[in-house]
């Protein structure tokens, strides 16, 4: 992969842009699938327990919207997986044995499970018993959640690669422990934080659609009961999302400290570091962090970041400059400087090339074990050998800084929203005098999606320049393609995904607009 040191930078940019485009569009559909699956399961359970036609009609209505969204999620997800082979073939070669395993399990087990039971859920109302149909609805949601588990396991491994070992004979990383990969603490935290956030989106969606009906004075009983269920789901999910987000922050601080420093625009670390609430970070320019100091017009919570990252008020949190220059940890171990890591990375690349050359000439060469041992020592810094300048190791601070605040700010607002609408739904009679609340529900829907996408932006852009944290930089993961061809497919996908999005929104709006509970009976 040494030729990748001179690869066209525009190819990397277009490949990243295309993957980001596909992922962002895909994530517009996935969270609603997971969120609605839970709520429609609860509604059908109400039908099973009461036998009331009202609950059956309500469950069928939300299942129709679920179906439209489910189909779009599948379509965009398939394209996303193919991009690993087309645009990121070096990545696929280097770690395909590990990364491919959870994706294969997801496709063989989880996707077939949800695809099977979603058919029963849609077409089995008059053909199977109420109990079997209820089980099919819940199993559809369970299958979708299991799919999310394996996909998030794969993504978490990119953030925190464990359970693997580099084989110099094949120039590939090979899995040494499936359980370490599947049950990585990073994967567990990421799964619960992501899935609980999708329940929030599902709850907001139900509140927004129900709010529209109440504004139009239509299907008011269905809307009221839907809001009651959605508000409870939303409150519980919001609390869980915040709690799991806290756990995730600790893991990020331990395994991706540069990401945390970028999220906080923290240039110089220390003990008892404050958490920035707001600051004036230029969104169009990487700040000059080398001069130290802090972002202008900063309002911060004393000791907040240390509490968030270490759960200690006086905990040490490294800043960008600490990570670039090297520092001594609390346990006495030393974090190498950027230049030291880059030097050891270049040595690993050189040692690997020498090992391969000797192995090809004489597989019994006595120098091979010594080279293999040296490579093993330097392999943790292998990816740094492809970094030309220490500045490349710093993610784009403005995007990470603002995206994190959008995620947290909207998340906090959502908690307040669910508390208010839940109070109105359960303690008062929802009437036209709460029109402002229904309008608020409609406004919260796009804000919720914005927060969800912002979370993924922090997760992925904050990892840059790495495709796999500390192991493989993006520049070494990309396929050797013409940048023009990738640019062309970028705009092709942009048009295709936009058409799919417009089609979904149009179909959903038509289903919502044309729904009439009396005609369903």
Where on the chain are the PLM-derived regions?
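Polytopic transmembrane helical bundles with strong interfacial aromatic enrichment
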Residues: 2-521
């Amino acid at each position: 992969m040494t030729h990748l040191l001179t690869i066209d930078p525009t190819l990397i940019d277009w490949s990243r842009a295309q993957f980001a485009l596909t992922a962002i569009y895909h994530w517009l559909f996935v969270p609603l699938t997971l969120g609605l699956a839970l709520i429609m399961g609860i509604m059908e359970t109400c039908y099973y327990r009461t036998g009331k036609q009202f609950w059956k009609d309500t469950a069928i209505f939300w299942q129709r919207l679920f179906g439209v969204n489910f189909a779009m999620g599948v379509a965009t997800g398939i394209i996303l997986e193919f991009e690993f082979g087309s645009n990121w073939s070096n990545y696929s070669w280097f770690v395909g044995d590990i990364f491919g395993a959870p994706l294969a399990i997801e496709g063989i087990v989880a996707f077939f499970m949800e695809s099977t039971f979603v058919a029963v859920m849609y077409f089995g109302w008059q053909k199977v018993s109420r109990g079997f149909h209820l089980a099919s609805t819940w199993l559809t949601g369970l299958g979708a959640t299991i799919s999310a588990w394996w996909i998030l396991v794969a993504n978490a491994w990119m953030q925190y690669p464990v359970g693997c070992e580099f084989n110099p004979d094949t120039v590939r990383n090979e899995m040494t422990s499936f359980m370490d990969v599947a049950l990585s603490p990073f994967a567990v935290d990421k799964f619960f934080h992501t899935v609980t956030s999708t329940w929030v989106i599902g709850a907001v969606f139900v509140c927004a659609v129900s709010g529209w009906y109440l504004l139009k004075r239509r299907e008011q009983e269905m809307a009221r009961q839907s809001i009651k269920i959605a508000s409870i789901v939303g409150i519980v999910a919001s609390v869980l999302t915040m709690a799991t987000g806290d756990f995730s922050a600790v893991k990020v601080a331990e395994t991706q400290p540069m990401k945390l420093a970028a999220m906080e625009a923290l240039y110089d670390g220390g003990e008892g570091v404050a958490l920035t609430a707001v600051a004036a970070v230029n969104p169009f320019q990487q700040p000059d962090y080398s001069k130290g100091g802090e972002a202008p017009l900063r309002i911060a919570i004393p000791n907040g970041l240390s509490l968030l990252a270490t759960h200690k008020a006086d905990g040490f949190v490294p800043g960008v400059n600490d990570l670039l220059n090297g520092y001594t940890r609390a346990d006495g171990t030393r974090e190498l400087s950027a230049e030291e890591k880059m030097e050891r990375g270049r040595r690993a690349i050189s040692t690997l090339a020498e090992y391969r050359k000797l192995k090809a000439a004489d597989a019994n060469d006595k120098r091979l074990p010594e080279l293999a041992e040296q490579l093993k020592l330097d392999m943790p810094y292998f990816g740094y050998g492809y970094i030309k300048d220490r500045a490349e190791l710093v993610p784009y601070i403005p995007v990470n800084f603002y995206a994190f605040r959008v995620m947290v700010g909207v998340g906090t607002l959502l908690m307040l929203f669910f508390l208010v609408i839940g109070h109105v739904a359960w303690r008062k009679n929802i009437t036209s005098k709460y029109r402002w609340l229904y309008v608020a529900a409609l406004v919260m829907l796009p804000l919720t999606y914005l927060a969800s996408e912002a979370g993924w932006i922090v997760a992925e852009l904050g990892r840059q320049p790495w495709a796999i944290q500390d192991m493989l930089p993006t520049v070494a993961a990309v396929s050797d393609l013409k940048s023009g061809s990738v640019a062309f497919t970028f705009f092709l996908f942009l048009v295709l995904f936009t058409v799919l999005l417009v089609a979904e929104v149009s179909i959903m709006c038509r289903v919502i607009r044309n729904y009439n509970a009396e005609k369903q009976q």
